[in-house]
């Protein structure tokens, strides 16, 4: 089963959209010192997703050209690794209406390492139960790494 089995319908303003595929938007530093963006297709196989992620992020970092998928529903992400953070709030502007996942640095403790994340979603797209199911599945996958 896919990590996002329940997110095929998304509401935007007064319209409801159905998408056949989903992608994760990733932001990467590029060789010019700026930021570039790519959309990595969601798939059931974590190794395939990772290979696609590595290829796309290396490409956009080197070429400074965004690689975006206009036909997929996009889940935004952001790795703010230059700092520690607990949350990012109010990301709802024109381009951030879909679910949004962000994180900062790992926090290394004496007995464990943690990575706090911030997950936002709009209730027109999913309910709290769906968000909790997503986070539980994400934690399950992280526990296998």
What annotation goes with each model-predicted range?
Residues 2-9:
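Short, small-residue-biased leader/transition segments that mark boundaries at the very start
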Residues 28-85:
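Helical lid/core segments from catalytic subdomains that handle acyl or acyl-like groups
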Residues 5, 22, 71-73, 95-97, ...:
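A generic structural signal for well-ordered coil/turn residues at beta-strand boundaries
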Residues 86-120, 124-126, 131-139:
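Intrinsically disordered, low-complexity linker/assembly segments
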Residues 16-18, 66-69, 93:
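Short, conserved, surface-exposed binding loops centered on an aromatic residue
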Residues 10-20, 24-38, 46-49, 88, ...:
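Catalytic/RNA-binding core of pseudouridine synthases
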Residues 61, 138-145:
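A common structural junction motif
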């Amino acid at each position: 089963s896919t990590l996002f089995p329940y997110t095929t319908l998304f509401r935007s303003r007064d319209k409801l959209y159905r998408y056949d595929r989903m992608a994760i938007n990733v932001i990467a530093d590029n060789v010019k010192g700026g930021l570039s963006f790519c959309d990595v297709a969601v798939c059931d196989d974590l190794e395939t997703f990772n290979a696609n992620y590595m290829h796309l992020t290396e490409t956009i970092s080197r070429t400074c050209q965004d690689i975006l998928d206009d036909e997929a529903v996009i889940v935004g992400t952001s790795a703010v690794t230059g700092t520690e953070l607990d949350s990012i709030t109010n990301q709802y502007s024109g381009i951030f209406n879909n679910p949004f996942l962000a994180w900062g640095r790992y926090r290394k403790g004496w007995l464990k390492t943690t990575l706090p994340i911030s997950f936002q979603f709009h209730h027109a797209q999913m309910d709290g139960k769906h968000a909790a199911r997503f986070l539980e599945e994400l934690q399950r996958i992280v526990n296998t790494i």
